[in-house]
Amino acid sequence: METTAIIRGVHISAQKTRLVADLIRGKSVAQALNILTFSPKKAAGILKKAVESAIANAEHNDGADIDELKITTIFVDKAQSMKRFSARAKGRGNRIEKQTCHITVKVGA
């Protein structure tokens, strides 16, 4: 049985988050949490929160044993970009796109 946790609209680019997600794909949840705890990247903290949520969902909703769980699926999708304006020289302006992403984590035995 797979249990899912989804975090939507995270303020970090999907490209940066996928780098960390690739490190924990297919690992046991204990090993994945250990990797995320000691990773210096911002995305690691966000993914750790998602993995912990998936573990809690599996324990509460499905009555799963935490020691047997592993990350079966993890993917990061691009979400909406926030368009912002940045003032430049001589009265001009540039558009800045602040990226967001959706994170989906599935855990199972």
From Swiss-Prot:
GO terms for biological process: translation. It comes from the Bacteria. Gene3D superfamilies: Ribosomal protein L22/L17. Keywords: Ribonucleoprotein, Ribosomal protein, RNA-binding, rRNA-binding. One of its GO terms (cellular component) is cytosolic large ribosomal subunit. GO terms for molecular function: rRNA binding; structural constituent of ribosome. Coiled coil: none annotated. InterPro entries: Ribosomal_uL22, Ribosomal_uL22_bac/chlpt-type, Ribosomal_uL22_bac/org-type, Ribosomal_uL22_CS, Ribosomal_uL22_sf. Part of the 50S ribosomal subunit. This protein binds specifically to 23S rRNA; its binding is stimulated by other ribosomal proteins, e.g. L4, L17, and L20. It is important during the early stages of 50S assembly. It makes multiple contacts with different domains of the 23S rRNA in the assembled 50S subunit and ribosome. The globular domain of the protein is located near the polypeptide exit tunnel on the outside of the subunit, while an extended beta-hairpin is found that lines the wall of the exit tunnel in the center of the 70S ribosome. Belongs to the universal ribosomal protein uL22 family. This is Large ribosomal subunit protein uL22.
